[in-house]
Amino acid sequence: MDLPKEIFLKEYKKPDYLFDSVNLEFQLGEDKTIVTSKIAVSPGTEGTSSPLTLHGRDLKLLSIKVNGKDLKSEDYMVDSRHLTVSRPPGGTFNLEIVTEIYPQLNTSLEGLYKSTGNFCTQCEAEGFRKITYFQDRPDVMATYTCRIEADKTLYPVLLSNGNLIEQGDLEGGKHYALWEDPFKKPSYLFALVAGQLDCREDSFTTCSGRKVTLRIWTPGQDLAKTAHAMYSLKAAMKWDEEVFGLEYDLDLFNIVVVPDFNMGAMENKSLNIFQSRLVLASPETATDGDYAAILGVVGHEYFHNWTGNRVTCRDWFQLTLKEGLTVFRDQEFSSDLGCRTVKRIADVSKLRTYQFPQDAGPMAHPIRPHSYIKMDNFYTVTVYEKGAEVVRMYKTMFGASGFRKGMDLYFQRHDGQAVTCEDFYAAMCDANNTQLPNFLQWYSQAGTPTVKVSSSYDASSQTFSLKFSQEVPPTPGQPVKEPMFIPIAVGLVDSTGKDMPLTSIYSDGMLQSLTSDGQPVFTTVLQFNKKEEEFIFNNIPEKPVPSLLRGYSAPVRLDSDLTESDLFFLLANDSDEFNRWEAGQVLSRKLMLSLVADFQQQKTLALNPKFVDGLRSILRNTSLDKEFIAKAITLPGQGEIMDMMPVADPDAVHAVRTFIKKELALQLKDDLLSTVTNNRSSEAYTFNHDSMARRALKNTCLAYLASLNEPDTTELAFVEYKSATNMTEQFAALAALSQNPGQVRDDTLLDFYNKWQHDYLVVSKWFALQATSDIPGNVANVQKLLGHPAFDMRNPNKVYSLIGGFCGSPVNFHAKDGSGYKFLGEVVLQLDKINPQVASRMVSAFSRWRRYDESRQALAKAQLEMIVSANGLSENVYEIASKSLAA
């Protein structure tokens, strides 16, 4: 095969031509769709005589005209990826292109395709080129009109971006709709939907008094499940006005629900398209986690209206400019509507579970990558979640009001433009009249920094010193690293468990006084931006225990000299609840790693009684938030522990985590039982923090108890399963029962399927639960489920649930006999023929094959080599597989 072409950030050039306006006409048909595109073109630079090169994939060109005249065949060239007009006229001109496409055959789900009988689009990042020939790049912004013609019976609803300005009937049972979007946008934000849909309608009055019509479109049978999404949308609109002063700018906002969708959701201007699971919810069919995800993602896509649509990215390398910022915004939104600490813990856990391994593997890239083969592969946890942490650091440095000033200046300067990460950095620094030395390294250096800290107390001078050093590990293409700018939020805790007032700090030859409007300061942010640096706190009357990196103020690994007793002390006393949780996590990680070493040396495993007591006191502490308690008694995941080992050992980590879980369940059994009993409720389901926290704590305790596999605890879980009145509690009980192989597990799984087989979203949960299971030899069960009548390889959600879920069970995916690897290798090649984007997400599970022992390495490598040598492999899969092999 021809090796795919790599694209580099440093090679960016402005477009030779600009598009001022784009008029699209779609004649939607069952066999083919005709697309007519009329574009007003102007030169990007005065007097340019360059050829005009347009992107295009899988298109049949029917005609091309310039200024109303057909072009002769010698005046343009077409190949499999481009249409080039050799000698465009000087100055402005009109370009008209007619193409024929086949949406019903488009299984890639990018461009225009059909999903359950409806037409639908997905254009980000480079899907618009599958609709018509175009400069398909984000720095080409134009105003759009879109006229859609279709059969009125089959497609009664016709939607596109902006405002509906005309509609009517046509001959032959057809009808049309004409949409106009007055705001300039890049092609990736174009959207079209046509089909049989019903809508939930509501309205929102903006802060300036504009009444906006809100509609959520879905097949009629699902309409009742859109109430929570509508609540989430209105809450997001209000929050963005209150927190960022950002008001919606059109009279209509549509959301459309689609069962077959590659992404979670898409922020197309005024016509958001969502995968079903991120909109549809009822207490009986969706869990608290689903409700929270819907709130966050509906918020996220709405927030893009300003951070992404009004101000967009100059090129795709800048993706974190819109995504890191908008993830940060949706995290803040969910925090304000729920419990901030619990949300922070969830976000940091996600970062450590998924992003840290990516940053330490062959696909490591900065939040702004330097190159890519296929942009779809860079919609990653690094660009999104680490990107959000980088945005959060601006807020940590400048405070909420300074961050708001930076945002205001960013919009004032760049509304209607396609810009870069440097533009955002400049707006933040200029608005606060401050420079952040070497902060831009976060955009260009890959890898997770490790910060080491040692402390010392001098009683005679009453000073406390913190010495920091930092190291960023080598990553592919970046062997040598520069020091990063790392904001470290610090508090000092006295022997009674209270925060000490901080008066002044000496560092780098400067004495800095700490006051805040005459009020004492208990947490300060240290600006650590050298290889090594010391900070000395003055007027510290006794030796404190430092609380470091409060609120997780930077996305780093922290290696401190805190003793075990310091950590137990912080677990009991730290006023920063995130660090209270973190102290427990550090203790858990240390315990698990030492037990893994014991297991590998075939020593008897024993649990530290202090650890059990520490968790018991958290469990009994009625002053703590219940969801916080649930998080605090949950052990770190297997992946997080494997990540800390020189050679990852999935069997040892699984055995140790299972041992600790059962031992805790045994020793805390009475406390766990009373917690389950005390947190039952017969009230109707409500989505609010207190109710969710109660369910989270109850379900966490139930999972511990069921792990014992004793008749009384199994019966308890079965009773909870049978008596549950909502999906959160029913599914948690099912998951608790599913930990142990046997008849009860099989019967309950079958009962659940029989009850919910007609709800495809619940069936996806059922697939995921079985796929992620750690029961021995699970690969055979998953193989069998591939042939289940409810499974469909063409539906991304089902693939993510079953195949993605299986890759999430380290002990089965990394089975010693290579059966997990073989299963994935075969599935990836099947999937690649249907949907390359989804296939490349699956093949990513192989990327860290070198972390394992030699026999596993050989087995995984064989699958990667088999994949790379396959005929007709997509660029998407080739990029991930070849980079994984090269590592």
Swiss-Prot record:
Site feature: Transition state stabilizer: 384
Cofactor(s) recorded in Swiss-Prot or TrEMBL: Zn(2+)
InterPro entries listed in its UniProt record: Aminopeptidase_N-like_N (IPR045357), Aminopeptidase_N-like_N_sf (IPR042097), PepN_Ig-like_sf (IPR038438), Peptidase_M1 (IPR001930), Peptidase_M1_dom (IPR014782), Peptidase_M1_pepN (IPR012779), Peptidase_M1_pepN_C (IPR024601), Peptidase_M1_pepN_C_sf (IPR037144)
Active-site residues (renumbered): 301 (proton acceptor)
Alphabetical keyword list: Aminopeptidase, Hydrolase, Metal-binding, Metalloprotease, Protease, Zinc
GO biological process: proteolysis
Amino-acid positions noted as binding substrate in the UniProt annotation, renumbered to this chain: 124, 264-268
E.C. no: 3.4.11.14
One function term, GO molecular function aspect: alanyl aminopeptidase activity
Cofactor binding, note field: Binds 1 zinc ion per subunit.
Enzymatic reactions: Release of an N-terminal amino acid, preferentially alanine, from a wide range of peptides, amides and arylamides
Class of enzymatic activity (EC top level): hydrolase
Pfam family, one: DUF3458
Binding site for Zn(2+): 300, 304, 323
Sequence similarity: Belongs to the peptidase M1 family.
Classification via PANTHER family: PUROMYCIN-SENSITIVE AMINOPEPTIDASE (PTHR46322:SF1)
Protein name per Swiss-Prot or TrEMBL: Puromycin-sensitive aminopeptidase
